[in-house]
Amino acid sequence: MIRVIKTIDAHVGGQPLRLVVDGMPRPHGKSSAQQREWCLKHADAYRRALVNPPRGHADITAALITDPSTLQANAGLVFLDAGGYPSMSGHAVIAVTTIAFERRLALAHPPGNGEERLVFDTPAGSVHARARLELHGGARSVDSVAVTNVPAFVHAPAVPVLVGRRDLRVDIAFGGAFYAIVDSEATGVPLDAAHVPELRRLGADISASVNLTHRPVHPADSSIAGVAGVIFTGPAVDPEAHLRNVTVRASGSVDRSPGGTGTSAVMAVLDAMGLLPDHQAFVHESLSGALFRGRPLHRTIVADYPALVTEIEGSAWITGEHTFFLDDDDPFREGGSF
């Protein structure tokens, strides 16, 4: 038997997103978190096939459109990557929104000029996407997408982490996923392409250490636990940006975009330190040179944690449409990685 899966691929700042549009079973569950759990138990072979070689790679994120679980939402989203099922992905929401309007998917009403909005339920909570559309050569395209994210907060500041001979301090913060945020100057590793292998190794070691000794758990949802990766921050290269970052996921993959959930987490840390002015854009730069614009919207409380609701804006470009075959006779139909 040969199963067929169709996807539309895009990128945000060079970071790929693969949106499944046909061929995967519809996940069951009354919430996005339950739908994610259903995928893990009943459809994980599809995730492995789409994100592992030969069809995918360690750095790719995929998304599956699901039924909404709240009245306000247009759809739900379940995210898939080499490490499993992330609770939230900002760059994925930007890409999915762009695909929805430019390819006129059923969840998006016919686009006009100006702004259009979509609401997605995710395992981390509901997020609002605001697409800015423009007319280019007679066709409407999405110029940018601003995502109002779930509340971000600092879970634990200045956590001591011993990695090899390095005695580091990291801030553990949540922005849709948990991250360990560290000043690159303290590590002695520059934030440039030549040092990506070293950043990759160090990031994986820090993630492992934090998850072993200071594993964070979301106070409102215990299914969201552990750091998803490490964010190395340092001086920006682009004069428009305030900070540069390199995000290394716990699996060791490197984000080419500034990271949507990561940008929210960094903003929460800056806000807690009194370094984030109200109602001013925070421009975050990635190693690829891509920029995200973050805006603080309002403060709130998550359990006992002071939290910040942020809006993260970036742009996506569609790169292709794919038809994948999963042949039951193929011993590598689910792919794999070393």
Language-model features: locations:
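A glycine-rich beta-to-alpha transition motif near the start of alpha/beta enzyme domains, typified by
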Residues: 1-171, 180-338
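Glycine-rich ThDP/TPP pyrophosphate-binding loop and its adjacent helix/strand module
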Residues: 176
